[in-house]
Amino acid sequence: MINIDIFIKGKFIRIFQIICNLINSLKANKFERDLIRISYNYKFHNQSKYSLWNTLNTFNKVYKKNIEGSIVECGVWQGINLVLFQKLIEEYSLDSCKIYGFDTFEGTPNPTKEDITKYNELMKDEYERLKKKDNTSGWNNASMDVVKNN
């Protein structure tokens, strides 16, 4: 049986994300719109357009403030954000900017009872559903070779 509160909350979140995607698309330049479209269409991505726009907007805040330094991503999964950052660095000729991706390449750790989804459901249930036969996480697990190939 569907919990109506969770259902309505999920629909509201989805509508909010669609509106934000539209606003972001209207504010973006052609390169940024194309970058989000291309990134979203990579076979190895698992992010929503909303998440990709948030990543791009965060990058732009740092870039427009002329903050120098490197980009660090902790937990790269299959590397979609690393690809996104590399394309941004190339586009804006940020030759001194380096990208560092850190990951255990062992998947997501076992969630606790405090870890819940945006729909207020236990993440542990999803984790258990995706667990491999050898009792390791099958959740967001990608090898270093997969990331390098992407």
Where are these regions (language model features)?
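Membrane-proximal basic amphipathic "stem/tether" segments
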Residues: 1-45
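A broadly tuned "polar low-complexity/structure-edge" signature
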Residues: 2-11, 59, 76-79, 86
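Short, functional N-terminal and low-complexity linear motifs
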Residues: 20-27, 50-56, 114
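S-adenosylmethionine/decaboxylated-SAM
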Residues: 29-49, 65-150
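Conserved alpha-helix/loop element of class I SAM-dependent methyltransferases that forms part
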Residues: 54-66
